[in-house]
């Protein structure tokens, strides 16, 4: 898989707002039929300050492995599928770093997400929100 849905006018869309993905032409079909989980140990976000940017490593509290909710494309013959990461409003404890965060699927909801048993709204309600973070280099 390759990261980023290809935009018709060029460029890549690496993130999709979970609140509107099912309505957007670029993501609609994938939101219904092609869901994926992207494994990670954390994700990184940069806080903008007057004196520059500060990089943070962020993950659910007490977890060493997390799965980001994603969507993927049906590839053309000979091409690799492409994926995008779903995002949501940032959890309260990290919103000072950035106003958005990836949708992190709880372990017990992973099968439901992959089998289309969860709607995007249900996934948002179940998504991990108790986050821990530290400055990263």
What function would you assign to each model-found segment?
Residues 1-137:
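Short linear sequence motif anchored by a di-proline
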């Amino acid at each position: 898989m390759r990261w980023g849905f290809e935009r018709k006018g060029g460029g890549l869309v690496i993130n999709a707002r979970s609140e509107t993905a099912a309505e957007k032409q670029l993501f609609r079909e994938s939101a219904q039929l092609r869901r994926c989980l992207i494994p990670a140990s954390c994700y990184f976000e940069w806080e903008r300050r007057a004196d520059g940017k500060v990089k943070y490593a962020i993950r659910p509290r007490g977890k060493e492995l997390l799965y980001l909710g994603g969507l993927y494309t049906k590839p053309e013959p000979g091409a690799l599928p492409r994926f995008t990461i779903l995002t949501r409003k940032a959890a309260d404890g990290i919103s000072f770093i950035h106003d958005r965060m990836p949708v992190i699927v709880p372990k017990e909801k992973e099968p439901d997400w992959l089998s289309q048993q969860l709607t995007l709204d249900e996934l948002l309600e179940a998504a991990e929100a108790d986050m821990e973070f530290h400055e990263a280099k």
